[in-house]
Amino acid sequence: MADDHKVESGLNTHVEKRAEEVHQLARQFTEQSTFSTAGQNPFAAEPGSVLDPIGNNFDALAWCKAMLHVHTEDEKAHPLRTLGIAFNNLYVHGFGSDTDYQKSVGNVWFEALALARKALGTQNQRRIQILQNLEGTVEAGEMLVVLGPPGSGCSTFLKTIAGETDGFHIDKESSINYQGVSAKKMAHEFRGEAIYAAEVDVHFPKLTVGDTLYFAARARAPRHIPGGVDVAQYASHKRDVIMAILGISHTKNTIVGNDFIRGVSGGERKRVSIAEACLSSAPLQCWDNSTRGLDSANAIEFCKALRMQADINGATVCVSLYQAPQAAYHYFDKVLVLYEGRQIFFGRTDAAKQYFLDMGFACPERQTDADFLTSMTSHIERVVQPGYEGCVPRTPDEFAARWRGSHQRARVLQDVENYNTKFTLNGEFLGKFRHSRRAQQARVQRVSSPYTLSYAQQVNLCLWRGYQRLKADPSVTISSLIGNVITALVIASIFYNLQPNTSTFFQRGALLFFACLINALGCGLEMLTLYAQRGIVEKHARYALYHPSAEAISSMIMDLPFKVLNAILSLVQALPFCAVVLLGLYSYTGFAIPTGYMLGWARWIAYINPINYGFESLLINEFHDRDFQCVAIVPSGPSYMDLHSRNQVCSTVGSVPGQAFVNGDAYIQSAYDYNVSHKWRNIGIILAFMVVLGAIYLVATDFITEKKSKGEILVFPRGHGALKSGKPDDFEGGSDRNASQEKSKSDRDDLTVIESQTAIFQWQDVCFDIKIGKESRRILDHVDGWVKPGTLTALMGVSGAGKTTLLDVLATRTTLGVISGEMLVDGKPRDESFQRKTGYAQQQDLHLSTATVREALEFSALLRQPAHVPRREKINYVTEVIKLLDMADYADAVIGVPGEGLNVEQRKRLTIGVELAARPALLLFLDEPTSGLDSQTSWAILDLLNKLRKNGQAILCTIHQPSAMLFQRFDRLLFLQAGGQTVYFGDIGQNSQILIDYFVRNGGPPCPPAANPAEWMLDVIGAAPGSHTDIDWFETWRNSPEYAQVQAHLSSLKLEHAQQNPLARVSPGTEREDRASYREFAAPFCAQLREVQIRVFQQFWRSPIYIYSKAILCVLPALFVGFSLFNTPNTIQGLQNQMFSIFLLLIQFGQLIQQIMPHFVTQRALYEVRERPSKTYSWTVFMLSNIGVELFWNSLMSILMFLCWYYPIGMYRNAEPSDTVHLRGAQMWLLIWTFLLFSSTFAHFMIAALDAAENAGNLGSFLLLLCLLFCGVLATPAQLPGFWIFMYRVSPFTYLVSGMLAVGIADTTVTCADNEYLRFDPVNDTTCGQYLAPYIAQAGGYLHDETATAACRFCPVADTNAYLRGVGASYADVWRNFGLMWVFIFTNIVAACLLYWWTRVPRVKKPVVAPQA
């Protein structure tokens, strides 16, 4: 009874406290108000009023109340919806398999066997329990904070509540009640009413913040908008409001960016994600660690905004937080504490701490409530009160058992029962909720649809966004249009003014075939674009903003003007080839393989090929009802003058003896088996194809989603001991947490491995200006400071204050903008070796995903440690770093990608470890090392940094959201405000007293005893959104005695080192003063090349999807062409078919380079963002290694391509008469080998200078078109205009086609097909042999029967060498052609390296030293 009374008393106290806080919040905003808001329309607010989100006086609370008033007064407005939740007996589980090991080219087949076993139901899957027996209620208007370390199940719980259960399963006995709505209806009919905001920020990087948020607001705009404004004004106003609340109004016209495209800062990007989710106006919101990357002030402001939503709109909010500030914790009503998936507390936030105190635990001084509750999950962090050592719980099961037996749990169960009684499933509330939702939807939208806008409105909105994206980044479209214009001019000049005679028959067919071919291949770039935006579209679908198919339609429509323009300007559109199936489309058009030569087993491909019908109609349109003058008569010459017309015939298929012309209909009927009656029928068939395929595509976009992440499961190489240990998989990545925490103290304190440092790094009057548009913006404004050995300096400031920029400038990692100021190491300017002698742990944990932890550390050690250090010593050093960082349990685990592989903490430790493995001789920079980590992990990271500090390491570290206890562990603070201006630089002091005294002395309010100084100082300078200060803290600092002391100390440091050795050149922090210590890179070139080449080969071996897709691209097209032309006969058309088999093989060039380019871009991004700035290895090593590994794999693929293409076609039989089967087979393989090597090096040549694979694809496709046009297949050298002969000679495909065709068909006879014989009568009293003897002697050819006296059957080609001469090829030139291909290959390599150096290697910018006053 006493416990019940205590709990009830605590609840009453909480209610009173919450009411008081709301009143204080209202008073705080009201004091800032200058206008009364009673009855005002927020959409018609006066400029500068408290309701104007653009003005400085904006009052968020006043706006919310005004908006609520307008909404309630409007009779047509939809009723406000609320959505609470009750869950009981909640169990969630997943399945792990035995195949969770690293896949490689060699072992990927085991995965196929496992899939087969799974399909047969014989695979044993391990059931993994994620959540166990959770219960609780969160009523409408309440806020729940979910606490627990990584791996405890926080993310899984939030996903379960939001209905996103992909990858795991909810037990059938579990109960979830959404205020009368079942979980099934919520996931389908009301998706978007309960949303899950993930920790990862996914946006269109080139879209501005304003456009990104306007789109989100517009997509959820209700049918009837209160306030008398249109939908555009409504969406714009809501966007401006949420941006003002979150403090990102200044980023409205800045692109969002991502890890590789510079845009808004990381903290601002996180707030963009928050704003986007808020604009969905979902009544149930689940936020997963959404304060990651935010400073304390903005984290508190975020929670304050959620509190306003809950209090005024009745929103239900569930949030998982790491390192939650105390002020943020107070905004929540309830707290759920999870310990390895078990619930160890659920209840009021003000009762949670007392629950554990009564259990026998103690809360250290200045520890926040949230940190105290989370510390219950770590036996190292939790503190037991004296006398309670033997009775407190220790394991997760013991904590859960204690909770199940508590009075608090009984009250929770009672609350769940009352809730379920009040809100019965599918009861009265469901009808009200559906009515409110329906009132918000467009009139034509389905009642059961989760979307607000109608389908047409969704398409229209996506069209608007597509146009904005096009404006932001038109480079791909413009390059495509320019390429098509140039291509049009080239093609027009080649086929200009075709004469109406039989000599142009092949050219007309080739031209139409080429038009169909290139337009059929126009989907390649679109596929790349669709995959790039897939994650964003799926996120918006989860928010119920629009159908994925609506985005698909809008992308089609957006492309239409450019496709129409392309059709007007040119016959073709050249884009990368992306699918092997396209080979069937352009092989079976009827031109490359005529209908009569299509084998019976493959004839059906032509029937389902829309390009076949298009080509037939185009050819009919070109030849129907036209007579073409004959230009070559057989026989002809001096011996055949004055003959009767029946004794001669036109040497063209479809000719009739005695006619001097050839009818077009007869020609296409004889040559292609085309019927003129099919012309309009084919157009109808094409339209039907368009409708059916378009419908399939739209349905697929709505139902087919990306492969879901398995969670952060540790993956080891196959055969590693960890796979056999039977440890359960961890779906959230926390399984190794306690293992790392259980290391002995002696192991943790072993710091002999870290080298002590002596160098002092100082900077003075550092400014950084960057040009944005036509204006210059100052990012850093006269920043001063120093870092000494054995000190840990914190760099803090509001998000966007320039903290990361300052680190980049100090670490010599900026390539843009203008830097001024002085940066010295022991009084001397930084030399070329500075970057490799410093460690820089970036905020983004970027690592090679296929490497293991140990390999990543060894790679850094081998290439970044001094060259004189023995290799064995470097490897041993890595082992010591692994021990130091407590990474032994996962040292051989694969890094993976974020979401799969190492968890956040492990990645952060690896990032620091990579820098430590380099043995930085000067200092260590760290950018947000605790961002996204829970309080215990953050403490462990700071513990590590303090160990490094004690051993003489100089450390400069930016940090967000430090607790008072974390903040106290730093020695000094460099504090920046917006604009990169210094607010304070100096010692922090015991209990932060020195820092506090400075601000109080200069006009700041006193710091409360229980307050966190790190949060308090942000409030003092007005850094939090909505807070203001009348004190110019930058000027205050510049006029303070502390600033004068800093300047004096900087001068003394410089003078001191100058006096020590004024003449010698000093490279501080090095052990040996030799020339090697001044080198840009620690390792010599050959060592760099060896190590990088080994790593790249390992990476490719461990990328089986990439390698096997490369194999498919080489094998399937070769097999397809080979068996489509299986054992091709040596007829005239057969020889042409064999030539086109080479042409079709060469077309795969585009597809091969398109596969390489995106892969290279990924590798280049990692190199340029992390490895190049740290001077790990040179750009030449990077380029040569990536080119070399592709050459190796393409060499292997050439063998497969050769075998799958050469022998099925039957070209080897052509070498039998000359007994050169083996020689010519080897020659053919060598030519195919050079083709693949050329493809690989050409891809690197194209992408070396360009950022986007799409732009490189456009350029590569254009050059590929030129190669195909001028290779001698579609137009022989004799048919080319004289101006274009040089293109025939510089095209590498010329020598490939010439060489491959000569090797394939030389030195054998030709046997004409029946339709290829020319039929005519000899003159009277002569045989056919006698009649044609003079002509055959002159022109060649042979007769079917020389003794015939009527109906002579003459074949104009007798041997394949004559055919080769006609197309400009000769077997004698084979070795020359092979040598020329190597010239092209080496030219590509040299050009790729030169282009990369010219366009992407940063030029060192020396800072401008400001003149001394």
From Swiss-Prot:
Amino acid composition bias (Basic and acidic residues), ranges on this chain: 739-748
GO CC term, one of those recorded: plasma membrane
Gene Ontology molecular function: any one: ATP binding
Ranges where the record places region Disordered: 725-748
SUPFAM superfamilies on file: P-loop containing nucleoside triphosphate hydrolases
Residues with attached carbohydrate: 289, 501, 675, 738, 1324
Biotech and industrial use: Variecolin and its derivatives produced by employing P450 monooxygenases from other fungal terpenoid pathways exhibit anticancer activity, thus, the skeleton of variecolin could be considered a privileged scaffold for developing anticancer agents.
Parts of the chain that traverse the membrane: 476-496, 510-530, 564-584, 683-703, 1105-1125, 1142-1162, 1191-1211, 1230-1250, 1266-1286, 1290-1310, 1378-1398
Keywords, sorted A to Z: ATP-binding, Cell membrane, Glycoprotein, Membrane, Nucleotide-binding, Repeat, Transmembrane, Transmembrane helix, Transport
Protein role: ABC-type transporter; part of the gene cluster that mediates the biosynthesis of the sesterterpene variecolin. VrcC is probably involved in the secretion of variecolin.
Family: Belongs to the ABC transporter superfamily. ABCG family. PDR (TC 3.A.1.205) subfamily.
Protein name: ABC-type transporter vrcC
